[in-house]
Amino acid sequence: MGKVLQKEAFGLAAKDNSGVLSPFSFTRRETGEKDVRFKVLFCGICHSDLHMVKNEWGMSTYPLVPGHEIVGVVTEVGAKVTKFKTGEKVGVGCLVSSCGSCDSCTEGMENYCPKSIQTYGFPYYDNTITYGGYSDHMVCEEGFVIRIPDNLPLDAAAPLLCAGITVYSPMKYHGLDKPGMHIGVVGLGGLGHVGVKFAKAMGTKVTVISTSEKKRDEAINRLGADAFLVSRDPKQIKDAMGTMDGIIDTVSATHSLLPLLGLLKHKGKLVMVGAPEKPLELPVMPLIFERKMVMGSMIGGIKETQEMIDMAGKHNITADIELISADYVNTAMERLEKADVRYRFVIDVANTLKPNPNL
């Protein structure tokens, strides 16, 4: 590969596993013939950003510019770009490239491509490391750019590029999107609250399952869930046993799967999208005797992500956010670690991060 021309950029980076983010000047490649460049307006803070800045998964490369819930406005397109033009509202989620030829890619599931390149902290083809959306602009292959519906507010749409697709994809893929179905959503956090909104928009009956009675009013009266179960209440769980077609489990803390499997109907599906640090016990007998299934799911493919955001536009689905300035990001990370946010932090990049005068 020949020499790649570069363009100055500015963002916030973690320099070591302390996880503290500070101003960082770097370069991005010039706009290639199939690239879309856009000014970043907003970027959501995902819980995985917190893990990555502290190298808690053992895969971080420093300096690390996080952010994979990125939205903005197109400023330049390459000569062979056909889907986008300057001035349009776009976003980039967790992926910026994949091989394009493996079974996963040909099936539209680039998220499972063994050679997929994540939006930050991964080696790119030009021997650079990808930098994410805590920055003033992005450049990305056209095929990994998502069009944002005009009616959606960009700040509240940003988290959908991770949280939204994480809950939407398994519901669609596993057929848990049929009107009249009964769907359980475990956990009412960044993923769970969006899961409730999509499941309701699909026409399903939704029950929120939580350890805390305190979230009942929020779940039913504000988010529109049909029912609420306290997972620590044996009577509530017993009364609801065998009633659910599927459950989306968004919880990352260690918890028992047995009560959740009990809530499922014959052939019911429990989909894990949270990522507990320690292994969970899997009771096998409910799987054998009632053909219940447990599976996992990770974000979604690009076509599926576009479908998700289009559905969000149709039904006015957005994340519930707390908009913050760039200089508040380290405090936000501390609060996120304590689960002190309802439900997603979003950085006002364009108005609070030092601008790049060359844009």
UniProtKB/Swiss-Prot annotation:
GO cellular component: plasma membrane
UniProt keyword terms in alphabetical order: Lignin biosynthesis, Metal-binding, NADP, Oxidoreductase, Zinc
Binding-site residues for Zn(2+) 1, renumbered to this chain: 46, 68-69, 162
The keyword Oxidoreductase appears for this protein: yes
Reactions this protein catalyses: (E)-cinnamyl alcohol + NADP(+) = (E)-cinnamaldehyde + NADPH + H(+)
Binding annotation for Zn(2+) 2: 99, 102, 105, 113
EC number of this enzyme: 1.1.1.195
Matching InterPro entries: ADH-like_C, ADH-like_N, ADH_Zn_CS, CAD-like, GroES-like_sf, NAD(P)-bd_dom_sf, PKS_ER
Pathways involved: Aromatic compound metabolism; phenylpropanoid biosynthesis
Binding site for NADP(+): 48, 166, 187-192, 210-215, 250, 274, 297-299
GO biological process: lignin biosynthetic process; response to bacterium
Cofactor note: Binds 2 Zn(2+) ions per subunit.
Entry comment describing in which tissues the protein is expressed: Expressed in the differentiation and elongation zones of primary and lateral roots. Expressed in the hypocotyl, cotyledon veins, vasculature of the first rosette leaves, hydathodes and trichomes. In stems, expressed in the vascular cambium and developing xylem tissues. Expressed in the style, anthers, stamen filaments, stigmatic regions in flowers, and abscission and style regions of siliques.
One term of GO molecular function: aryl-alcohol dehydrogenase (NADP+) activity
Any single Pfam family the record assigns to this protein: ADH_zinc_N
Required co-factors: Zn(2+)
Subunit relationships: Homodimer.
PANTHER family membership: ALDEHYDE REDUCTASE
Function of the protein: Involved in lignin biosynthesis. Catalyzes the final step specific for the production of lignin monomers. Catalyzes the NADPH-dependent reduction of coniferaldehyde, 5-hydroxyconiferaldehyde, sinapaldehyde, 4-coumaraldehyde and caffeyl aldehyde to their respective alcohols.
Protein family per UniProt: Belongs to the zinc-containing alcohol dehydrogenase family.
The protein's name in its UniProt record: Cinnamyl alcohol dehydrogenase 8
Organism: Arabidopsis thaliana (Mouse-ear cress)
